[in-house]
Amino acid sequence: MLILISPAKTLDYQSPLTTTRYTLPELLDNSQQLIHEARKLTPPQISTLMRISDKLAGINAARFHDWQPDFTPANARQAILAFKGDVYTGLQAETFSEDDFDFAQQHLRMLSGLYGVLRPLDLMQPYRLEMGIRLENARGKDLYQFWGDIITNKLNEALAAQGDNVVINLASDEYFKSVKPKKLNAEIIKPVFLDEKNGKFKIISFYAKKARGLMSRFIIENRLTKPEQLTGFNSEGYFFDEASSSNGELVFKRYEQR
């Protein structure tokens, strides 16, 4: 199984590293082209394009400027340890063993606006470039046109290398839109997480994001290799609801804490 997750806006380059092993991103030639485009933007343009504050725009203009084609542990850190959003709160990669990192390196991929596809141990320099941003480039009007089939092809390589044709889609819609399902040599399974609120079950963004991380961790810790094993997921009160599920969608629910 190949797990797909989204990146995070919040980054951590300060915490102690729990592994010294690293690999290099495989699509850096493409990343360099995007950096070339991003460096043309002024901080006010970045603020408008990304809908962020002037302060954040200044930080990200500096990140684009400081980005270097040579990645080392001095200027970058492993992607799975650098991202720190809700998904990664659930994933808790900082507590992984070396064997966990090994399994994740083969079975987990992070989709990225700048790097395309990241393996957990791929070094990553800090950036902010969400997949949905309309950054004009030599290949089109946005990042979806820029990446084209590249992300899908890279995922097909990963699928072939890890031995089956199942993708567990735990990425957001914004990021999974960069994948072309018809060209992906895989059966796609999407876990959905519903939380009870006032007697009704619905997707609550914060909880759903964290649950995607919890599910990723569940697969990695237990070395799961078959989709039917996912139904045993019960972290933090979630349970599988077979009646609400379909072939391509596994529904997990959690009752409101009273």
Swiss-Prot record:
NCBIfam families: PRK02101.1-1, PRK02101.1-3. This is UPF0246 protein YaaA. The lineage of its organism: Bacteria, Pseudomonadati, Pseudomonadota, Gammaproteobacteria, Enterobacterales. Belongs to the UPF0246 family. Transmembrane segments: none annotated. InterPro entries: YaaA. It comes from Shigella boydii serotype 18 (strain CDC 3083-94 / BS512). GO terms for cellular component: cytosol. GO terms for biological process: response to hydroperoxide.
